[in-house]
């Protein structure tokens, strides 16, 4: 099961429904949309994710961007996630998604230029109802497609959730790969250090 809002109330509700359906705990799990995206993107050909991948989800007034990059840790590739949100973008409900994007493409493109000046990604994936259109405006398309592969679709999260479920019986992600999306870090990680002869804990990660 994949959900957009990883909130405890929603997770508890899903858990209660699943229990009433009499599924065992090992038969189901809940993952975030970002994690579904990571499963989907990193199950593709290596050339599509080698430098990193970006997801742009335009379902609401602002665009959510999720960027996944690999870091090597003790011989393992760790997929780390960074998330960013644009400012609210004016949207006219009387017009279709293409017409709205034509009006707002310069504002969105400038935001993406700032974001992608910090990251080198191999591919960009577009999803969300406000990106649902047959073609995309020229300025927006020229920028995104420059030295990058770009894909658009509305079933990305579903495909990613299916691939995530398959990991229990089949290798989906590349060998020696650890998925470390933010919702996967469920505990704090600390190590003891000594500073000026004083023992103290160093916090490495926290939920």
Name each region found by the language model.
Residues 1-10, 112-143, 149, 153-154:
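Glycine-rich phosphate-binding loops at beta-strand->alpha-helix junctions
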Residues 1-54, 145-146, 194-207:
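Nucleotide/phosphate-binding catalytic cleft detector across ATP-hydrolyzing
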Residues 19-21, 83-87, 97, 162, ...:
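Extended charged low-complexity segments that act as oligomerization/scaffolding linkers
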Residues 37-44, 102-120, 164:
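Phosphate/ATP-binding catalytic cores across multiple sugar-kinase/actin-like superfamilies
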Residues 41-83:
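Gly/Thr-rich phosphate-binding beta-strand-loop-beta motif of the actin/hexokinase/Hsp70
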Residues 70-109, 164:
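Glycine-rich phosphate-binding loop plus the immediately following alpha-helix
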Residues 155-160:
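Repeat-based blade/solenoid architectures
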Residues 163-207:
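Acidic, glycine/GT-rich loop-and beta-edge segments that sit at the periphery of enzyme/chaperone cores
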């Amino acid at each position: 099961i994949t959900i957009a809002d990883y909130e405890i109330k929603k997770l508890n509700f899903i858990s209660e429904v699943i229990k009433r359906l009499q599924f065992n705990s090992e038969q189901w799990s809940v993952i975030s949309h970002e994690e579904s995206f990571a499963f989907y993107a990193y199950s593709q050909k290596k050339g599509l994710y080698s430098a990193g991948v970006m997801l742009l989800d335009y379902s609401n007034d602002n665009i959510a961007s999720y960027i996944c990059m690999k870091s090597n840790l003790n011989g393992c590739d760790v997929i780390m996630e960074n998330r960013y949100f644009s400012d609210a973008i004016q949207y006219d409900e009387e017009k279709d998604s293409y017409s709205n994007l034509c009006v707002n493409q310069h504002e969105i493109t400038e935001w993406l230029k700032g974001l992608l000046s910090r990251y080198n990604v191999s591919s960009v994936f577009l999803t969300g109802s406000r990106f649902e259109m047959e073609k995309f405006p020229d300025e927006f398309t020229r920028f995104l497609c420059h030295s990058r592969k770009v894909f658009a679709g509305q079933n990305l999260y579903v495909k990613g959730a299916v691939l995530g479920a398959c990991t229990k019986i089949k290798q989906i992600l590349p060998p020696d790969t650890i998925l470390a999306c933010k919702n996967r870090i469920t505990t704090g990680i600390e190590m003891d250090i000594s500073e000026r002869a004083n023992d103290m804990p160093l916090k490495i990660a926290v939920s």
